[in-house]
Amino acid sequence: MVKKAKWLKNVKKAFSPDSKKLKHESVECQDSVISYPVLIATSRSSSPQFEVRVDEVNYEQKKNLYPPSSDSVTATVAHVLVDSPPSSPESVHQAIVVNRFAGKSKEEAAAILIQSTFRGHLARRESQVMRGQERLKLLMEGSVVQRQAAITLKCMQTLSRVQSQIRSRRIRMSEENQARHKQLLQKHAKELGGLKNGGNWNYSNQSKEQVEAGMLHKYEATMRRERALAYAFTHQQNLKSFSKTANPMFMDPSNPTWGWSWLERWMAGRPWESSEKEQNTTNNDNSSVKNSTNRNSQGGETAKSSNRNKLNSSTKPNTPSASSTATRNPRKKRPIPSSIKSKSSDDEAKSSERNRRPSIARPSVSDDETLSSSTARRSSNLIPTTKSARGKPKSQTSSRVAVTTSTTEESSILPEKAPAKKRLSTSASPAPKPRRSSAPPKVEKGVLKAERTP
């Protein structure tokens, strides 16, 4: 700070005039120029001794075209002072000093003096300016000024560099924001166009984020469900041993759960379709159950009605017909040999093994109908034998033989027809139903009472 203050003082001194010197200098005589206060001093007392002959001075000046020199002026002044008698100091101050402007008027002398003083002032000022320029030149060529100039230039360069970087960054950010805004607008327009064209417009009051969160939650739930099902299925498969089928399905032998996992994944990926299909399947199952129950009821009713008709026909008092049937077949039927029976049983076992399926299923409605019809036939064949046995004890042996032959024939015929009916029932029945026990009605007591009454 001290050096800076000194430097500023030096600069100010270089450009400021010397006012102090002008104040202290009262009278200066440079280049034979008399100052203004000396010329203004005039004597109030005009004495004839000190009168100056103006005509003579003018005449001399006219002769000499150039103005008188300083030596002549000083000589004249000294001559006048020598010639004058001694007097008081007041009279000395009032003495008129003869100068070179003696032959001119006062106005002309004043104008000349003013011009000379003004020219001297201009010359002094020019010299001061020249001195100040030299001092300034010396200061500018110094090391301090050079150091300060280098520092200022570096600061200006850094400021300009920072400003240029800030401007370029602002321009780049504005361009990036514009490009991003355009991309968002294009994406939004594409989404709207796709939704309008697809017709999958969502009219819910939820926001896009909420809808996406719900879809993600559903997807995670389906994936969890699929994993749980796969885990349970693998454990069930490890616990159970499935029998190999004759015609295996098309699947990967290394991965036994190939078809199941693919189907489950496909169904889990479409929850709305799976819900609709489940509803349809439940409706179909309900309708099939209703149809099966109706068929069961109809089959049971028909079986019951047929059994009742047969029982009524058998309970009627037709003793001569029974006796005639017993007398018509007096011949004894030959019993079937054991070899034929064994062959028929082997054939039946082979046919049943061929037609047997690996799937475990319960007998359906047709099986119940076959069982009911077979029991009804057996009961109808047994009832007349009891009547004839009680009516005619002599023909007991023949009736027993007939009954045994008829039962063996029926037993040999029924197993051959049963597998075909079972195959039809398993293919026609939609789902396994519980077994319906169809036993023949107990009619022995009623028959005995009807026989006793007549």
Swiss-Prot record:
InterPro entries: IQ_motif_EF-hand-BS. It comes from the Eukaryota. Expressed in roots, flowers, stems, siliques, inflorescence stems and whole shoots. Restricted to the vascular bundles. Its main location: nucleus. Residues 280-328, 371-388 have a biased composition (Polar residues). Binds to multiple calmodulin (CaM) in the presence of Ca(2+)(e.g. CaM1 and CaM2) and CaM-like (e.g. CML8 and CML9) proteins. Interacts with KLCR1. IQD1 overexpression leads to increased resistance against herbivory by generalist chewing and phloem-feeding insects. Residues 343-356, 442-454 have a biased composition (Basic and acidic residues). Residues 272-454 are annotated as: Disordered. Induction: By mechanical stimuli and aphid infestation, but not by jasmonate, salicylic acid, 1-aminocyclopropane-1-carboxylate (ACC) ou auxin (IAA). Residues 103-113 are annotated as: Calmodulin-binding. Keywords: Calmodulin-binding, Cytoplasm, Cytoskeleton, Nucleus. GO terms for molecular function: calmodulin binding; microtubule binding. It comes from Arabidopsis thaliana. Residues 397-412 have a biased composition (Low complexity). Residues 107-136 form the IQ domain. This is Protein IQ-DOMAIN 1. It is found in: Nucleus; Nucleus, Nucleolus; Cytoplasm, Cytoskeleton. One of its GO terms (cellular component) is nucleolus. The lineage of its organism: Eukaryota, Viridiplantae, Streptophyta, Embryophyta, Tracheophyta. May be involved in cooperative interactions with calmodulins or calmodulin-like proteins. Modulates expression of glucosinolate pathway genes. May associate with nucleic acids and regulate gene expression at the transcriptional or post-transcriptional level. Recruits KLCR1 and calmodulin proteins to microtubules, thus being a potential scaffold in cellular signaling and trafficking. A motif (Nuclear localization signal) lies at residues 421-428. Belongs to the IQD family.
